[in-house]
Amino acid sequence: YADETVGGSAVPMGDHWTYTFEAAIPEDAEGSFTVSMEGRIEVEVDYGNETDTERDYAENPMMAFAVTDTEAVERRMVVDDAKCESCHVNLRLHGSNRHDVTYCSTCHAANTVDIADVPESVHMKWMIHKIHRGAELENGYIVVRSRGTYDFSNIHYTGDLRNCDACHVNNSQQLPLADNLLP
């Protein structure tokens, strides 16, 4: 996982932009990787007696590319955003510019923890289930970040937690899971 701020480093190429990552692909990398992006445009709006900064948030594009696979393998569809939106209505996180559940898995990958001092898994499949069960968990679910502590212990899922199809698609919750999935 590499996180880079593009800022003024992108180069216009006609109606597109190019950017060369500083982080190299690890020499032992295998399979397929995904490149994704988040962004927003900030515009100052003059309302006559005051000005304010408005933000227009971009979609979260993702592109899989093959490292050693013959063809790029896309991330599997586990949950559909439309199902999230049926409860959350315009779900946006981390400054409102992350709003696609598949995109979330780009950073919230296996073996990802919040901070080293008080490690709590933020792997998407672990984290999302714990958040939705918050109030039912014996010890709750608290995530400590550099920007603050987030306590999900009071979250009550309004549906039936046994109804996996309320969120999952394509029988993605069915066991046994495929052997080639990340832990």
Tell me the role of every PLM-derived stretch.
Residues 1-183:
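Extended surface/linker regions that mediate inter-domain or inter-protein docking
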